[in-house]
Design a protein with these regions (language model features):
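Alpha/beta-hydrolase active-site loop
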Residues: 134, 166-188
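Short, surface-exposed "cap/lid" segments of acyl-processing enzymes
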Residues: 101-103, 108-141
Length: 380
């Protein structure tokens, strides 16, 4: 059973408490099941959580770090905020507000992928991948265009309350984002009728879930979202990764594939005991996509080794079948699941850390695509 995080006197997670998250539980699982078999441990974990490399290995201090502050020359301010959920706990976040742009501003809420993540969607600061802060970059690009942006620490991460995010189902995560939307609608600086959502990976599935229920959502961006259940994603990842093993016979490859599929089935069989895992395995994004009526931009890297690139078109087609006439798909060449430029795309921790030695920024192509599209649908 996952351990509930300890709280400090003010009800915020202690920065010194290291809790057993989904990562530690799965690490123990793959060791027991011998799922590795020539596969790096980091890749095995990625088969289970599509953006696990972002996971924060330790809690951020309750006092927001200075790196959440904008550059002094930026044409926007950054305000530390607290968003109260319907369950009464507070989510810590940063609200960037443009300067010298007409008010009230259009606004966007950013939605993180799976696994415990801070508001920048960065990993542990001690880990080199911590230099990769995609949500800070997206917030900067949008606020420089006159769009307010709210990004929040996941529940139980950083300065946010709410217990362990690993125990939250996908619909429960959506409720946290809805709290952020309500918060924006109550800000005088924000136009309540011009609010959009941008989500990556699992966050890309949460955005449509909210938009299908809330007609006030003006537009959504889906980054590397899936079009099938978590079970299907896991099986695809295993097949994809096994096919890339070099120096083995077809017979040996089949044996490895069978062993890995058996391990995945065991992992899935335990889903009833872990709320997030159960919702991940069962949730079908296509059923939601059919009911999304607002404008949608779907982005996917053609080197994504976590979610098949074809899923971008599957989502778009389902939305169009449901009557949505404003769905745009853009496949970015040589972009991986992190939306970094990468001609290979295969996931290993070593590969990604080496990649980040050369680039830790989202591509200009991606940032321009997002900011232009959001501006045209919210600000123009």
């Amino acid at each position: 059973m996952l351990q509930e995080p300890k709280s400090s006197q003010n009800g915020v997670i202690s920065p010194f408490h290291r809790k057993r998250t989904v990562s530690s539980v799965m690490l123990k699982f793959v060791k027991k099941t011998n799922l590795l078999n020539g596969l790096s441990m980091s890749r095995v974990l990625s088969l289970f959580l599509t953006v696990s490399i972002f996971a924060g290995c330790s809690q951020l201090p309750c006092k927001p770090p200075s790196y959440y502050s904008p550059d002094p020359a930026a044409p926007y301010t950054a305000e530390e905020v607290r968003v109260v959920t319907k369950n009464g706990y507070q989510l810590a976040g940063t609200l960037t507000l443009p300067v010298n742009f007409p008010r009230p501003f259009p606004a966007v809420v950013l939605i993180t992928g799976s696994h415990p993540q801070n508001r920048d969607m960065a990993g542990s600061i001690k880990n080199p991948i911590g230099r990769y802060r995609p949500f800070r970059q997206i917030a900067d690009a949008l606020s420089c265009r006159g769009i307010a942006v709210l990004r929040m620490d996941d529940r139980g991460v950083g300065c946010s309350e709410g217990g362990d995010i690993a125990n939250a189902t996908i619909p429960e995560r959506a409720e946290d984002i809805k709290a952020g939307i309500r918060y924006l609608k109550n800000r005088n600086e924000v136009d309540a009728e011009r609010i959009g959502l941008i989500g990556i990976s699992e966050g890309g599935n949460i955005g449509p879930m909210i938009a299908s229920e809330d007609p006030t959502i003006r537009a959504i961006v889906i980054m590397a979202g899936s079009a099938s259940t978590g079970r299907d994603i896991l099986e695809w990842q295993v097949r994809y990764d096994t096919a890339l093993i070099e120096g083995v016979s077809d017979e040996e490859r089949s044996r490895i594939l069978k062993q890995r599929m058996t391990a995945v089935e065991k992992w899935i069989a335990e889903a009833d005991y872990m709320p997030w895992r159960k919702s991940f395995v069962e949730y079908n994004p296509l059923r939601i996509a059919h009911n999304v009526r607002c404008p949608v931009l779907i982005l996917h890297g053609d080197r994504d080794a976590h979610v098949p690139v074809e899923h971008a078109h599957l989502l778009a087609n389902e939305m169009r079948k449901g009557g949505n006439r404003d769905v745009t798909v853009k496949i970015l060449a040589d972009h991986n699941h992190l939306f970094l430029k990468d001609k290979d795309g295969r996931f290993t921790n070593k590969r990604y850390l080496k990649l980040l030695e050369h680039t830790n920024r989202l591509s200009d192509e991606l940032l321009t695509t997002i900011s232009d599209w959001i501006y045209s649908h919210l600000a123009s």
